[in-house]
UniProtKB/Swiss-Prot annotation:
Assembly, per entry: Homotetramer.
GO biological process entries: glucose metabolic process; glycolytic process
Protein family membership: Belongs to the glyceraldehyde-3-phosphate dehydrogenase family.
Keywords: Cytoplasm, Glycolysis, NAD, Oxidoreductase
Protein name: Glyceraldehyde-3-phosphate dehydrogenase, cytosolic
Binding site for D-glyceraldehyde 3-phosphate: 151-153, 182, 211-212, 234
């Protein structure tokens, strides 16, 4: 099977890391990048140097208006309107929509005008079907041309919830994600009309915020629809977040049994998506962690046989970007 030919729209945190992950995994080939706000030389600089994930180990050059990574040429465009991007000209059948702007199906479909055949939105979508690797990607059918990879938090929470629900049953649950700073936040207090707290300085505050990540689990696991909700605290760290899930179980169990269940899933059915650790870890230990979810056995607690708090770590940048690449590989296999 030929590897999928991919274009990336939006060369921000996720766009750049999707390119890195694609090169590492070698399951898809990035042939084009579109970003109207970054010129070619700056694009090369931003890809080469990364404050969180380190300097790119391969070669990065520019030549004849193209970005050359490890000797491979990538066509560069700078269009604001997705309908104007000539994806077919570069040979891109799949598009990673990582601007954070075109998350609605109708807007993402504009990529088809330029020749794209499939669009994978690297964000939650209100109307495009959402798929989480390890959880519901088996529900994907080839007639779906615009899909969402959900959010980084949903990618951590859903595998955890799936394992627990299948073994014990979840009656209801509340999630808090302690979430690293992202590009939408302000370095110092600034205007944020829709979210006043979100406009406060990221480096100086713990900021309560909303998240649809827990409710989105109900979209990828319909049997849990309406049983989970949650919120976020944005904290002054550059990467790695942690899910704190408090659930009421349908059947009685012990925390030792929960640990054994999570460990077994990490070694078998969820291998590569879910990991398990009993070590005394902190957030920086998970920078560049490829798994969607790392269950922290030592951090969870149990109040009684049906009520517990479970903790799982995730690199909200690198883990998520790897799942975008994995989802494209899965979609391509079924075409």
């Amino acid at each position: 099977m030929t590897v999928p030919q991919v274009g990336i729209n939006g060369f921000g945190r996720i766009g750049r890391l999707v390119l890195r992950a694609a090169i590492e995994k070698d399951t898809m080939s990035v042939v084009a990048i579109n970003d109207p706000f970054i010129d070619l030389e700056y694009m090369a600089y931003m890809f080469k140097f990364d404050s969180t994930h380190g300097r790119y180990a391969g070669s990065v050059e520019t030549k004849d208006g193209k970005l050359i990574v490890n000797g491979k040429s990538i066509t560069i465009y700078g269009h604001r309107d997705p309908a104007e991007i000539p994806w077919a000209e570069a040979g891109a059948d799949y598009v990673v929509e990582s601007t954070g702007v075109f998350t609605l199906k109708e807007k993402a479909e504009k990529h088809f005008t330029g020749g794209a055949k499939k669009v994978i939105i690297s964000a939650p979508s209100k109307d495009a079907p959402m798929f989480v690797c390890g959880v519901n990607e088996d529900k994907y059918t080839p007639d779906l041309n615009v899909i969402s990879n959900a959010s980084c938090t949903t990618n951590c929470l859903a595998p955890l919830v799936k394992v627990i629900h299948e073994k014990y049953g979840i009656e209801e649950g509340l999630m808090t994600t302690v979430h690293a700073t992202t590009a939408t936040q302000k370095t110092v207090d600034g205007p944020s009309q829709k979210d006043w707290r979100g406009g406060r300085g990221a480096g100086a505050n713990i900021i309560p915020s909303s998240t649809g990540a827990a409710k989105a689990v109900g979209k990828v696991l319909p049997e849990l629809n309406g049983k989970l909700t949650g919120m976020a605290f944005r904290v002054p760290t550059s990467d790695v977040s942690v899910v704190d899930l408090t659930v009421r179980l349908a059947t009685e169990t012990s925390y030792d049994d929960i640990k054994a269940t999570m460990k077994a899933a990490a070694e078998d059915s969820m291998k590569g998506i879910l990991k398990y650790t009993e070590e005394a870890v902190v957030s920086t230990d998970f920078i560049h962690e490829e798994a969607s979810c790392v269950f922290d056995a030592g951090a969870g607690i149990m109040l009684n046989s049906r009520f517990c708090k479970l903790v799982a770590w995730y690199d909200n940048e690198w883990g998520y970007s790897n799942r975008v690449v994995d989802l494209i590989a899965h979609v391509a296999k079924l075409q």
